[in-house]
């Protein structure tokens, strides 16, 4: 990933990075380009956060967003899972696999003067677009849960080996086509 004007996810560039967006595709266009995050910072932020808000669209055109845990290792794939084999998320994905993933973190609000509307929020956000597919391979599902436990669990936890309930979960792999990272230092930018 690079600054929005230089490319990022969606096909290899000369630098080995993935283009962020095509100039004609509004998904990756950022209004305030000075807040655009460099490639390495965007990847690290996406890897380090804990909750992804995943947006789909239902059959009637209504947006549907769910918070999910996820694994991202710095490449062009993001892994998510649900345990529901009959829910809205799965129905929406089966009809239209294109999703938008948002990962964000808020910092403090800087008080503005002389009016409240002059205040500004410190924040970081990453938005990733791309299709998802369902992964049925048990080895990949086991890998995912190993990664989840490493990311979210406590190092002192011990378990019996194996994952006997793998068939109860649905593992999704998002192929990231476009991504943008944005950071604001509030009033200190």
Model segments located where?
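A generic structural signal for nonpolar/aromatic side chains embedded in well-ordered alpha-helices
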Residues: 46, 92-93, 148
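Short, structured patches in soluble enzyme cores that scaffold and shape functional sites
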Residues: 56-58, 82, 103-105, 176-178
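A sequence-level detector of short linear motifs
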Residues: 65, 79-80, 134
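An N-terminal domain-cap segment
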Residues: 25-75
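Anion-coordinating catalytic cores for phosphoryl-, nucleotidyl-, and glycosidic chemistry
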Residues: 12, 34, 43, 90-91, ...
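Charged, gly/pro-rich active-site loop segments
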Residues: 2-34, 106-189
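A generic structural signal for short beta-strands and their flanking turns/coil linkers
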Residues: 50, 66, 74-76, 95-102, ...
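A short mixed-secondary-structure module that forms the rim of ligand-binding clefts
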Residues: 71-109
């Amino acid at each position: 990933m690079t600054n929005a004007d230089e490319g990022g996810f969606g096909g290899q560039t000369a630098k080995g990075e993935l283009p962020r967006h095509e100039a004609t595709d509004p998904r990756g266009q950022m209004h305030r380009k000075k807040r655009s995050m460099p490639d390495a910072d965007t990847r690290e932020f996406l890897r380090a956060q804990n909750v992804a808000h995943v947006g789909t669209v239902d059959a009637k055109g209504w947006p549907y967003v769910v918070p999910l845990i996820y694994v991202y290792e710095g490449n062009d794939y993001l892994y998510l899972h649900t345990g529901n084999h009959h829910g809205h998320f799965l129905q929406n994905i089966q009809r239209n696999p294109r999703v938008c993933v948002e990962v964000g973190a808020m910092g403090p609000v800087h008080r503005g003067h002389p009016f409240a509307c002059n205040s500004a929020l410190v924040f970081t956000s990453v938005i990733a677009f791309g299709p998802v597919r369902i992964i049925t391979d048990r080895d990949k599902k086991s890998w995912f849960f190993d990664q989840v436990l490493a990311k979210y669990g406590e190092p002192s936890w011990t378990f019996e080996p194996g994952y006997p309930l793998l068939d109860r979960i649905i593992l999704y792999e998002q192929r990231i086509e476009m991504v943008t990272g944005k950071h604001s230092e509030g009033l200190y930018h």
